[in-house]
Structure formats: C-alpha cells, structure tokens
C-alpha cells in the first residue's frame, strides 16, 4: 500500500511544496480547510501516485496539537466542504519597472477545484482525498518556480492570513534566509483574499490583516520583519516587506 494511504505519525517535519503561481493564487480556504489541504500535500511529498491520500485523526492531532476526537470532528466537518473548494489563477504576472510584481488584468482567470472526490471513515477515524488532475501539475515534480517550507512552520498559526504571508515570504526568501517582497496593495489583497471593507480602507487592512500576521510570524515562526507602506500622493499604493530568519531562533 502507498505511504499516502497508511497511518503515520506527526506530519510537522514534512515539506509543503507548490508552484509559485499557486502560492500567489486566491486559495479559497478557511484555517481548518487549509490545515487539511496542506497536511495532505505534505504527506504525499513527491509520491502522488493516483493523487489519493488518507489523513488519520491521530496524524492530524499530533501535527496540530489536538485531542484525537476533536481532530476527527474537525476533519469530517471540514472535508465535506472541500469537494467544492477551488483556487483562482489570475492572468499572467508581470513585473513593473520598480520591481513590483503585478498581475495582468487581461486574459483568462481560471478557477480550479482542489479535489475530485472526498470521503470519510468513522470507524478508522480518517478522511480520504483525491486531487483533481488539473491541480497536480502545481504540486508534483516541480523543478523551478516553486515555494517550499516545512509544515511545522504553520502548525502553531491561528490565522489563515499569517499562513498566507508565511508562504509569500518563503517564495521570496533566498538561500541565506533573507528576502524582500514589493507588491501593489491590490495584488496583496487578492493574494490574502481580503474582504471588501479592508480593500477600501488601508487602516483596516493594516490593523486587521497585515500587523496581526506580522506579529504572529515573529512570535511563532521566528521571523524578523520590516514593513513599509508606499504612497502616491495621499494614497497607499504599494507595500514592501523585508524579512529574515531570526538568528536567535532555534525552531529548526
């Protein structure tokens, strides 16, 4: 039987690997759904086989610090919604002269379902997931333009915004553990799937998404983060993040 289908221990030391286009995409997930999806990706590693994976409540509980009964309830409750979840790929990215990555506004926008089918087994305390054929090229056998991090880095996070920011930082982190990311406010909001009220009010965006996410990554995943809001006139139009691993940290 494939390792994807058997019970293992904690998944926290396994890697999450995905194409950069997927990292930037709107993923359409709440925190529990994101935990399930990326646990599945981490468990499969590079052994996708038929695109099927089983997640056991014991694995999920050990990974995210939950009681087994609570873990299975969370798995079963959320997996039922994941059959219809999808990610959104914007038109081809482009880079402006100031180095800011900006998404194209013309061209096809694709909405791609994560899973072809889902299942659950009350007796064995597990769920089953089968990825769609369209998503596998963004997760499997990647040679370039990909984001990689250990699931452990996200296990303690309590905000999906923090997790999204972690992924975007990892996409732009160099071999020395340092990096920077400049992005338009519009594209940042798209990647973070910010509500309309925050898109229209930078003060709310900063206080309810940006700063809490920065604070959580500093506290729980050992980052040093600098942040700048860049204005044109009186309006904030771009963001710049500078980040590196805290040399005093011992997470790994």
Question: Can you describe what each PLM-predicted range is?
Answer:
Residues 1-252:
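Charged, alpha-helix-forming regions
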């Amino acid at each position: 039987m494939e390792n994807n289908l058997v019970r293992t221990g904690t998944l926290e030391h396994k890697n999450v690997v995905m194409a950069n286009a997927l990292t930037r995409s709107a993923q359409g997930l709440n925190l529990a759904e994101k935990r399930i999806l990326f646990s599945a990706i981490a468990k499969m590693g590079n052994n996708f086989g038929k695109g099927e994976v089983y997640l056991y409540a014991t694995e999920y509980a050990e990974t995210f610090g939950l009681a087994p009964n609570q873990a299975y309830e969370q798995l079963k409750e959320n997996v039922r919604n994941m059959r219809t979840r999808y990610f959104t790929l914007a038109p081809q990215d482009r880079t402006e002269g100031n180095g800011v990555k900006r998404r194209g506004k013309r061209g096809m926008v694709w909405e791609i379902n994560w899973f072809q089918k889902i299942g659950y087994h009350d007796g064995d305390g597990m769920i089953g997931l089968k990825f769609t054929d369209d998503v596998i090229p963004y997760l499997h056998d990647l040679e370039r333009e990909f984001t990689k991090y250990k699931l452990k880095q996200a296990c303690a996070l309590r905000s999906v915004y923090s997790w999204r920011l972690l992924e975007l930082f990892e996409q732009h982190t160099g071999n020395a553990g340092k990096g920077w990311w400049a992005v338009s406010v519009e594209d940042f909001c798209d990647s973070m799937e910010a509500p309309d009220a925050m898109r229209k009010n930078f003060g709310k965006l900063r206080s309810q998404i940006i700063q809490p996410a920065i604070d959580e990554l500093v506290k729980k995943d050992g980052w040093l983060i600098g942040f700048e809001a860049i204005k044109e006139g009186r309006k904030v139009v771009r963001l710049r993040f500078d980040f590196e691993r805290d040399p005093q940290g011992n997470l790994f």
